[in-house]
Amino acid sequence: MQEHLIVTLDGTDYLVEPGTSLLEFIKSRDTFVPSICYNESMGPIQTCDTCMVEIDGKIERACSTVVNRPMTVNTQNNDVKASQKEALDRILEKHMLYCTVCDYNNGDCEIHNAMDAWGLEEQSYEYKTKPYEKDYGPFYRYDPDQCILCGRCVEACQDIEVNETISIDWNREHPRVIWDNDVPINESSCVSCGQCATVCPCNAMMEVNMEGNAGYMTDTEPGSLAAMIDLTKKAEPGDGLLFAVSDSEAEMRKERIKKTKTVCTYCGVGCSFDVWTKDREVLKVQPSHDSPANKIATCVKGKFSWGHINSDQRLTKPLVRKDGEFHEVEWDEALDVIETNFKRIKNEYGGDHLAFIASSKGTNEESYLMQKLSRQVFGSNNVDNCSRYCQAPATKGLFRTVGHGGDSGSIEDLERAAMTVLIGTNTAEAHPVIASRMKRAQKLFGQKMHVFDIRKHEMAARADAFYQPKPGTDLVWLGAATKYIIDNDLHDKAFLNDWVDNYEDYYKSLELFTMDFAEETTGIPKEQIISFAEEAAKAESMSICWAMGVTQQDIGSDTSTAISNLLLVTGNYRKPGSGAYPLRGHNNVQGASDMGSMPDQFPGYQKVADDEVRAKFEKEYGVELNPTPGRDNHQMMEGIHNGDIQSLYLYGEDTGIVDSNINFVQSALEKVDFLVVQDEFLTFTATYADVVLPASPSLEKDGTFTNTERRIQRINKALQPLGDSKPDWEIFQLIAQRMGADWNYKHPSEIMDEIAGLTPSYSGVNYERLQGFNSLQWPVAPDGTDQPTLYMDGFNFENGRAKLFPLTFDNFFKEDEVYDLHVNNGRLLEHFHEGNMTYQTEMIKYKVPNAFVEISPELAKDRDIHEGAELRLISETGEATLIATVTDRVKGREIYIPLNNDAMSNGDLGAINKLTNSDVDKYTDTPSYKRTSCRMEVLTRKGKSPLNPTNFRVDKQRNPQYSVQVQKKWERPDYVFPGNVVDK
């Protein structure tokens, strides 16, 4: 390792590690150098030229200089100051300073701050307007007149988000930011991640919700605002008065703009950020370099989809059904009805006749209390959560082989991996921020990406190798690839010898998985499987991600097991960039399971049948607990039909839409004696309820979420609950108290303390350790030490060794002459699942108003149907009517239906789960959502496309490039390097 180098900074010697950014080193010494285009999350862009310093006698940019030799650096002499002023003046030539009436005057305008800190008294070049109008997208707008062409937005779009939409046209007389090949924002391939607005150093790129709302004097009509700007320019002539006045106004804004750190309430990535609110209005979501899962990245939902918070469809009072209709009542009356019926059913039938479904949208603390309510108060283990619908098979596969039911590493490992494998996961739409990390690694650092999926989604289109197996056959090619690796002596023998058991039995089970069998069964040519196997074996590190395309099959547990087997055989656990990543769907589906909202497990995956474990919980709960595992979600519905379940209480779960075969589920909801639903809205499921309780969303409460990488993060209350709605944990406590339980929690932190005392994997978790952007990845030791990478001290079995698990395959998909189409389904980027929350944001609904069905060009030709055709799809269980879009994302007789359908407005007419059946994975009861067939009736042969023509999926042409292409700026005849001005 090279020794430290001596850097002499303004006359003082320092020892600096080789490879350090000079600008970062200068900043670390509390020495000011302006650096307007630089962002620590993106690195040097080199467009603003403000970071001029003298290095060994020569004026150079500090941002792009790496300490790789001893050097003498001066930041203060006259030449340096003159070159910095030249650069700052050139920026003010492009950007008008009217700070006091600017919505961005919130203390973090980097142009304002740089000019103020530098001490610029007056500018040398007059501001010049540009011949362009503002461009408004649905969520953010671009003002060319304020743009300094720093290129941060370009870097974010091209090389961080890797959507590759934004660039700068340097060839114009007046360069500007453009979208695609110079189209308006709303007509471009922009996916509205908002990262451009996040990183913009000024008000050029700004959230629409900020405009006219942030300042005391910014909500005026355009003409009046222009007059105020002119007045401001005269009153603030570029000297210190400008900053004094605007700084005072910025301080005043702090009294009405609240900034609260929270965590996104949508998918399992766990993006954290500050949410800016004024009264009840969400102005802005601002991620941070310190955000552990996402850094500065967001997607359209986390950045902009907050319309549900103030939706006029929010429930603000309890509802009780009387004479077949809902009536608003006070809390006491609703609780009276619940108490009476819960006690009646418990006394008449016993606690086992009540069932409880926890939400994966709620907090850890709330999921914990739901299972505690079920077990302590009612003596029932009939408690579950929506991991039953999606991730239970992945958890099963990991418990079989490595012993923990969670990601083996961190999101960072997916970026570090030499090779990533995506199986049955539409990552770019379901986990977009994770997808961006992998797209960046592939684009900039040469990561190899292999995608196995039946649908050609974005990640498939970007992949180095894309394979399209027949539905439900992933287990076969996985087995064949693993067998090939062993048979050709490519397996990691040292790893297997040191860390893995059951090799002989496992290898014997691979006899079936020949290349010929794999090719015939999967449809993937054996040459492609061999090529994949060889790359997987030789890769320095390999991570495998999978999701619903694997788990929502009737062999989801076995396929998940096969994935882990392959990782063990290639030695891809216990090292950076490797491991198993079952991408969790909801913001807290990992946490809901961690907290014991499952019929056979207490918090921390401790078995209810284990006498020692149960005794521990009995001591804490003060009652004898039921040792018999209860019913899961699927079994609850069967139990209602069989007369074994009389009451169902669920929160934050739209079971009547999201469960499989909702025809069967809806009839159960009609039949159950007493149904309590707790939610933000009168959901489709809530329409069946006897009592509906108004719950508060994440911005209105405190708590914690656990994301897909086992990362525990705090959410903080930003707003008061709307109307009489309450956080779920408070509602559970009210019900428990009505049932006679002594619950007296004052704050969720007390609930977490109780969790930590009972749950070894959370034993070191407390709110103090989760302040700000701090987080912990379980298991967490009592002293707060966590484990970003699992299994470094051995696998989670008694002997510390992993287990290869033998498998077989006899699950052949039989084509049906009547139901001749295979139905695939999944998320769209803009919506989350059924869309109850996302449909409340107007511009999200504008972009994707309804569900639709994707059909292939081949199928369209065969059936003589065209874009906009109205189709009735009929399966063995039900039917759905949808509008078609023709796309090569699907092929042959594969069709694809998004999960969102706005059931609160449209009912279940286009719901995918009208078609799905009741088949399940035999080990977990997870429904086989992806194993659905249907037939088609054509109602109309063509019509209006279901996709808004502005949607990014509709004939958009991205403009990929590397970074901002600053060389084109430097080649312009009007460009002058600030150091050259000094030299002259």
From Swiss-Prot:
GO terms for cellular component: membrane
Keyword Repeat found: yes
EC number per UniProt: 1.17.1.9
Domain 2Fe-2S ferredoxin-type positions: 3-79
Residues binding [4Fe-4S] cluster 3, per UniProt: 157, 190, 193, 196
Domain of life: Bacteria
Top enzyme class: oxidoreductase
Domain spans labelled 4Fe-4S ferredoxin-type: 138-165, 181-211
Binding-site positions, [2Fe-2S] cluster: 37, 48, 51, 63
Alphabetized CDD domains for the sequence: fer2 (cd00207), MopB_Formate-Dh-H (cd02753)
One Pfam match: Fer2_4
Family: In the C-terminal section; belongs to the prokaryotic molybdopterin-containing oxidoreductase family.
Protein name, UniProt field: Putative formate dehydrogenase SH0748
Annotated source species: Staphylococcus haemolyticus (strain JCSC1435)
